[in-house]
């Protein structure tokens, strides 16, 4: 079994008559469309398996009807699974008796919906405290805790206002505060920010990320906004037709999309904001070592010409970057009869970039630099190079 705070194994949900027959037909290779046409059964979720780590924000994405909202409701059993298992902290939620399931939801789970679902007759404080009221906490205890979480989301001064007196973003903050009030270890958020305008949505993303830094919780976040997923997600799971097509970090999926469906999700993404120098580096620039004696200019010139390369990098015996030199400059030295060694005074100094430098910052450096730029690892050693050609190819998705 996979490890994690939440582990989903071979999960299915079939709506309609004879659900087990529909699962058997899926395993035989029938499409969900054929099963619907010939058996009248709708496949909501099909053989989904994945895990979510403790303290992770795991984002589920997919087109409308791909099964995202059904899947998260199978995890907390608002919808009963047809087959499969859901483990939370090692406990199989799919097999729990109703009383234990209710206790688990009250103690350990919260959910935030796209519609704020605030009670209009209750003030902000009472809305935030509602989960604690259901859990049987005293008025004093729940109001104290509700004020704490309202403070966290920046709404303490609005505690005695009513929902109609708040903006949409503020109402969603109340919904988030209500989810946090019971101090759950996991939160399920179903397109929680999608009804907000772009500025308010980003503001709520900032609130969530800030709260996560202060008190890390396990969060499953459903979104249709790829920029949102890239910004807040530790990992992203992409669904299509009830199946989980790919799971990975934003960088992993950008670099290695599973298929065209996944690739199309990222067509509008500015990759330079999410990739780093380390992910773009290559060994495309010939490397020569200054090991107490500088490389010979004629030898370097001949090798560059043979490789059809225009630049060379020089490193010392410990792989520290020493400098760069162009084929044009070396050729002039050689043609002038000066087949001397490439000592430091002949090299061009270029400040290397660290592997974790975001690509948008790398682009700025490439624009002002004539040739490729060197990349160094965490220990300061040379680890590769980035050229303009390499950058353009990567941004084109090649």
Please give the residue ranges for each predicted region.
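Conserved ABC ATPase "signature" region
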Residues: 19, 24-34, 91-92, 129, ...
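Conserved ABC transporter NBD signature motif
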Residues: 84-92
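Conserved ABC ATPase signature
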Residues: 162-166, 170
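A short, proline-enriched helix->beta-strand linker immediately N-terminal to the Walker B motif
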Residues: 181-185
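Conserved ABC ATPase "signature" C-loop
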Residues: 241-242
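ABC ATPase "signature
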Residues: 247-248, 256, 324, 385
């Amino acid at each position: 079994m996979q490890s994690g705070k939440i582990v989903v194994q071979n999960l299915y949900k079939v709506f309609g008559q004879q659900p087990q027959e529909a699962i058997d037909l899926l395993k035989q290779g029938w499409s969900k469309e054929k099963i619907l046409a010939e058996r009248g059964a709708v496949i909501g979720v099909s053989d989904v398996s994945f895990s979510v780590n403790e303290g992770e924000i795991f984002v589920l994405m997919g087109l409308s009807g791909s099964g995202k909202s059904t899947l998260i409701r199978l995890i907390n059993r608002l919808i009963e699974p047809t087959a499969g298992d859901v483990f939370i902290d090692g406990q199989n939620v799919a097999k729990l008796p109703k009383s234990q399931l209710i206790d688990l939801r009250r103690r350990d789970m919260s959910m935030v919906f796209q519609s704020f679902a605030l009670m209009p007759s209750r003030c902000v404080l009472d809305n935030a405290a509602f989960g604690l009221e259901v859990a049987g906490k005293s008025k004093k205890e729940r109001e104290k805790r509700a004020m704490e979480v309202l403070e966290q989301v920046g709404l303490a001064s609005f505690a005695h206002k009513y929902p109609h007196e708040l903006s949409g973003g503020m109402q969603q903050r109340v919904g988030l505060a209500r989810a946090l009030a019971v101090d759950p270890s996991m939160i399920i958020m179903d397109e929680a920010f999608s009804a907000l305008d772009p500025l308010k949505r980003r503001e709520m993303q900032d609130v969530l990320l800030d709260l996560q830094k202060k008190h890390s919780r396990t969060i499953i976040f459903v979104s249709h906004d790829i920029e949102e997923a890239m910004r807040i997600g530790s990992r992203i799971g992409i669904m299509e037709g009830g199946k989980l097509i790919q799971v990975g970090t934003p960088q992993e999926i950008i670099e290695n999309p599973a298929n065209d469906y996944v690739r199309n999700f990222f067509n509008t993404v500015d990759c330079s904001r999410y990739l780093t120098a380390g992910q773009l580096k290559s060994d495309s620039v010939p490397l020569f070592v200054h090991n107490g004696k500088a490389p010979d200019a004629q030898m370097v010139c001949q090798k560059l010409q043979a490789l059809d390369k225009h630049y060379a990098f020089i490193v010392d015996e410990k792989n520290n970057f020493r400098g760069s030199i162009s084929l044009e400059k070396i050729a002039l030295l050689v043609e002038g009869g000066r087949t001397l060694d490439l000592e430091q005074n002949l090299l061009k100094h270029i400040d290397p970039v660290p592997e974790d430098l975001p690509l948008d910052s790398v682009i700025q450096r490439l624009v002002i630099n004539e040739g490729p730029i060197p990349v160094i690892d965490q220990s300061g050693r040379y680890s590769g190079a980035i050229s303009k050609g390499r950058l353009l190819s990567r941004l084109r998705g090649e």
